[in-house]
Design a protein with these regions (language model features):
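C-terminal motif of bacterial Sec signal peptides marking the signal peptidase cleavage site
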Residues: 21-23
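Class I SAM-dependent methyltransferase SAM/SAH-binding core
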Residues: 83-141
């Protein structure tokens, strides 16, 4: 009986191992996912369709004092290097360039060719000499390593369909002591928002630590800032967050 039990246990372990290997192979062969994301776990949450390039009219946002509140919370100072991810038409890019001044730099990133083109024209028209523009991909913002004091993601993180790959590629771009700033809305991910608990879980899975969280009406949502707190995990070691339609997040 004992020998039979050992045989069954060994067989069960072998089957489990084969299942893991098969799952890895399936992930690598899943052509519906970007090649650069296939080594990472898939997020178990719905994602909103990419919204328009203008979250709201710029004067309306200025009347609420949105950008000033966000930049104050993020402690954006002259001389800093800041990345504006999902820059769109450049609402934050323009205001960040004023805040960091001529000795600072702003890198504006987007994945939409039309937005990139329009933003390029705006930068040229307004002679924003301390702004650079790059085109990223949905799973990788393509930021240079060790370059930024702040990485800003305003009302766009909920549109990231490969969060584990995205944050893994993003993380090395921070300078020591740098922060990733997220401004978003507390609602399900398929309704153009992300619950804070799920946000914390996804960032935690990549070795980030929450350092500030504020909810303000001027933001039409909440502000969250993260710092690197541990080693960057290997893609295969990342533990995906369990979710219920993007409403919760626990590892």
């Amino acid at each position: 009986m004992t020998g039979q039990f050992k045989f069954r246990t060994t067989a069960g372990l072998m089957l489990a191992a084969l299942a893991v290997v098969s799952a890895c192979k399936l992930s690598r062969s899943d052509t519906s996912r970007p090649e650069a994301a296939r080594d990472f776990p898939q997020a178990f949450r719905p994602v909103s369709a990419v919204g328009g390039t203008e979250f709201a009219a710029e004067d309306q946002r200025d009347n609420l004092g949105e950008a000033q509140v966000v930049m104050d919370l993020a402690a954006i100072k002259p001389g800093m290097r800041v990345a504006d991810i999902g820059a769109g038409e450049g609402y934050y890019t323009v205001r960040l360039t004023e805040r960091v001044g001529p000795k600072g730099r702003v890198l504006a990133e987007d994945i939409d060719p039309v937005s990139i083109q329009n933003l390029g024209r705006r930068v040229e028209r307004e002679r924003l000499d301390n702004v650079s523009i790059i085109t990223g991909t949905p799973e990788d913002a393509k930021l240079p390593a060790d370059s930024f004091d702040r990485i800003m993601m305003v009302h766009m993180y909920h549109e990231v369909s490969e969060p584990y790959a995205f944050l893994w590629y993003l993380r090395p771009a921070l300078k020591p002591g740098g922060q990733v700033v997220v401004v978003d809305v507390d609602r399900p991910t398929d309704q153009h928002g992300i619950p804070p608990r799920l946000l914390f879980c996804e960032f935690g899975a990549l070795g980030f630590r929450l350092v500030q969280f504020v909810s303000k009406p001027e933001l039409n949502g909440y502000y969250a800032a993260f710092e690197v707190a541990g080693a960057r995990p290997a893609p295969k070691d990342i533990k995906p967050c369990n979710t219920a339609s993007g409403k919760t997040g626990t590892q």
